[in-house]
A protein has these predicted regions:
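Short hydrophobic helices that act as membrane-entry/anchoring signals
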Residues: 23-48, 52, 60
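Active-site and donor-binding regions of nucleotide-sugar-utilizing enzymes
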Residues: 45-178
């Protein structure tokens, strides 16, 4: 079931009031930004391959969509996507997730995190509320894969974490970002 435009605006206002708005303009996204990000990722590859903690969610961060999400792709289209970096941000946004799901039980919600601790907590608390996954690396192919798979109506990013490539891709697709 889709989420109405007025519901999205209400959620956007609530999140913006509580956490501040994230600008949708990402005009400075250039080849050099992506090149530098990819180079840093390449330099970090040995750490990512040999440290179990750093390896957590690596495939999801690269844009490889897990089967549990692929199998629900149609159902998740038009979802609300909440992003919380870690435990603190997740704890801040969780009451909003619960309240929204209570008011709109048929709405599809997804939650992404960046850290393993945030991921573990989100999976535990959102078991019956939302699909949980790792936020993609800010590279064109990773962002495209997740945005194609989910086709969200709105992305709510907690705190002020800003990813220029992700922001640009959302803006290009007309996805509301708060």
């Amino acid at each position: 079931m889709g989420i109405s435009s007025s519901d999205l605006k209400k959620v956007s206002r609530k999140v913006s009031k509580r956490h501040g708005s994230v600008s949708g303009g990402a005009t400075a996204v250039t080849f050099s930004y992506y090149f530098c990000f990819a180079l840093l990722l390449l330099l970090a590859l040995p750490l990512l391959l040999f440290k179990k903690k750093a390896r957590a969610g690596f495939s999801e961060k690269l844009g490889i969509i897990p089967g549990r999400i692929k199998s629900k792709q149609r159902q998740l289209a038009g979802c609300l996507w909440f992003h919380a970096v870690s435990v603190g941000e997740f704890n801040a946004v969780f009451p909003l997730i619960k309240a929204f799901k209570k008011e709109h039980p048929a709405a599809e919600l997804v939650v992404s995190t960046t850290t393993g601790t945030g991921q573990a907590l989100a999976r535990e608390k959102c078991r019956d509320l939302a699909e949980v996954f790792y936020f993609p690396y800010d590279l064109p192919f990773s962002n495209k894969a997740w945005l194609d798979a989910l086709s969200p109506s709105l992305v709510a990013i907690t705190e002020t974490e800003i990813w220029p490539g992700f922001t640009y891709e959302c803006k290009k697709r007309g996805i509301m970002l708060t």
